[in-house]
Amino acid sequence: MPKKPSRKTIVNNLDKVFSEYIRRRYAKNGIAECVTCAKKDHWKNLQAGHFMSRKHYATRWDEENVEVQCMACNVYRYGEQYLFAKHLGEDKADELLAKSRTMVKLKDWELQDMIEIYKKKLLELEQ
């Protein structure tokens, strides 16, 4: 019987498939654009930037909370929060802020289900 994956492994796997989905969802012919500075590059060279930090499970895998960002904006400019909020609009930014403050406890099987959902979504993007 295979060893049950650790919680950390499950979360990392979900982060990986979710990030790829976000970046590929916005790509046209493999090229995506940074939401904050408009830099265009291949989706593999860009990142999935979070408006509300990944530490908040309530919004960590919320598709409205995550957009394509270049490494400069996402890492070195701390996500360019002001420009990100401007892109989202005040109401959506406030909604995500409130949602991020809610307590969410996801079970391992729920995270595994989300992995399968995003794998299916990636397959749909390929068609």
Predicted regions and their residues:
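Short microdomains enriched in Cys/His and/or Lys/Arg
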Residues: 54-68, 89-100
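Histidine-centered nuclease catalytic patch
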Residues: 33-65
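Short Cys/His-centered divalent metal-binding micro-motifs
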Residues: 38-42, 66-91
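Residue-level detector of alpha-helix boundaries and kinks
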Residues: 3-7, 55, 73
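Conserved aromatic-histidine-acidic binding/catalytic patches
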Residues: 10, 58, 76
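A boundary/linker detector
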Residues: 1-21, 26, 38-40, 96-127
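Short metal-coordination and nucleic-acid-contact micro-motifs, chiefly zinc-binding Cys/His arrays
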Residues: 15, 25-33, 62-66
